Amino acid sequence: MSIRHFALAAIASAVFAGSAVAKDYELLNVSYDPTRELYQDYNAEFVNYWKKSHPDDKVDIKQSHGGSGKQARGVIDGLRADVVTLALAGDIDEIARLGKSLPENWQTRLPDASTPYTSTIVFLVRKGNPKGIKDWGDLTKEGVSVITPNPKTSGGARWNFLAAWAYGLKAGGGDEAKAKEYVQTLFKHVPILDTGARGSTITFVNNGQGDVLLAWENEAFLALKEDGGKDKFDIVVPSLSILAEPPVAVVDKNAEKKGNTEIATEYLKHLYSKEGQEIAAKNFYRPRDAEVAAKYEKQFPKLDLVTIDKDFGGWKTAQPKFFNDGGVFDQIYQAQ
C-alpha cells in the first residue's frame, strides 16, 4: 500500500471510529406549567429508546416549567432550550420572530402542525359540587369564586379565556359586545391570577381557595388521581370548550450550538410513536394516534369544541386582539 493510500485509509478509519464514539448529551426541554409528570415519564422512555441504538451514550434530560408565555420570554432572552414544548403555537411563533432561533414555518416540520397531543378546558369543583356549577353561565353567579391563571403569562389561561369568550359569544347570539360583557363579569369573580396553570391548581387544591378551577383537562384528572383527590373534587364538563393544541419544536440555534440537533429532533419525533402516545394518554393528554386514542376513548369525555384556527383566526390574530397590551383582556380587566 502506498503512503498516500495508507494515509487515506487511516483517515477513513479515524472518521468511522469517531462516528461510533459515545456521546454525552444534556438536553433542555423548556415546557409549560402542568407537563412535569408527562415529561418525567416520557424522558425515561426516550432515554431507553435512544440507548437501543446508541448504547454507550449518556443522556441527561433537564426540564424547565412555568407559564408558557413566561417560558417563551425566557428562551427569547437567552434560556438555552434545545426543545420547547409550550401551551400554544403563538408562544413558539414569538421565539421564532423575536429570538430568531428557529424558522417561522416550524409547525410544518412535524405531523399535526407539530402538536403530538391535545387537551381541552374543564372545570374542577369541590366534592359534591356545592355551588351547583354545570356550565360557563354558572361561573358568574353571586358568591362563586373562580380560579384561573393570568393570560399575560400563562398559555392555559389564554385557552381558558378563549373558551369563555366562545361561550359568551354563543350565548349572546354572536354579538362580540355580549361576549366581552360576559368575560368581564367572569373575571370579577377571579380573586387571584397566578402566573401559571400549576400555580392556580395549587391555589385551588392545596390552599383551598375558590369554588371552581378552570383547568387543563389533564390537570383536572391529575388532581383526582392524587391521594384522596376523588374524595375532594369532581370534574364538570361544560357544554362548550376549546381544542387546546400545545405544540413542540426544536430550537435550532441552541441545539446546533450544543451539538444536540439529532437527538433533539428524535426526542420530539418519538412523541408520535406508540410508546410516546401511550405515555401522553396515561398522563391524561388526548393522543393523536388513532389506535391509542381508541384504547383510551372512555377516559376522555366528548364535548363540543371550538378551535383556534377556525373560530379565532389562529394565534397570529387572537394574540394581538385579546392578549397583547391594550387587547380585550386588558380592556376588561383594567376596567374593574
Predicted regions and their residues:
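Bacterial N-terminal signal peptides
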Residues: 7-17
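Sec/Tat signal peptide C-region and signal peptidase I cleavage site
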Residues: 18-22
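N-terminal segment of the mature folded domain
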Residues: 23-154, 333-334
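Short beta-strand->loop
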Residues: 30-32, 125-127, 145-172, 189-190, ...
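A bilobed periplasmic-binding-protein/Venus flytrap-type ligand-binding module shared by bacterial periplasmic
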Residues: 120-129, 245-262, 279-283
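Short helix-loop capping/hinge motifs at secondary-structure junctions, enriched
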Residues: 128-134, 153, 166-174, 254-262
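Ligand-binding pocket segment of bilobal, Venus flytrap-like solute-binding proteins
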Residues: 171-239
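Extracellular/periplasmic juxtamembrane helices and adjacent flexible linkers that interface
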Residues: 255-336
